[in-house]
From Swiss-Prot:
GO terms for cellular component: extracellular region. This is Thrombin-like enzyme albolabrase. The keyword Lipoprotein does not apply. It comes from the Eukaryota. Glycosylated. It is an enzyme of class 3 (hydrolase). It comes from Trimeresurus albolabris (White-lipped pit viper). Keywords: Blood coagulation cascade activating toxin, Disulfide bond, Glycoprotein, Hemostasis impairing toxin, Hydrolase, Protease, Secreted, Serine protease, Toxin. Thrombin-like snake venom serine protease. Releases both fibrinopeptides A and B after 90 minutes incubation, but only fibrinopeptides A after 10 minutes incubation. Clots fibrinogen with different clotting time depending on the species: bovine > dog = human > goat. Fails to clot both rabbit and cat fibrinogens. Expressed by the venom gland.
Length: 11
């Protein structure tokens, strides 16, 4: 996912 928030949730 290109973005910041969703990537953070994924991590």
């Amino acid at each position: 996912v290109v973005g910041g928030d969703e990537c953070n949730i994924n991590e």
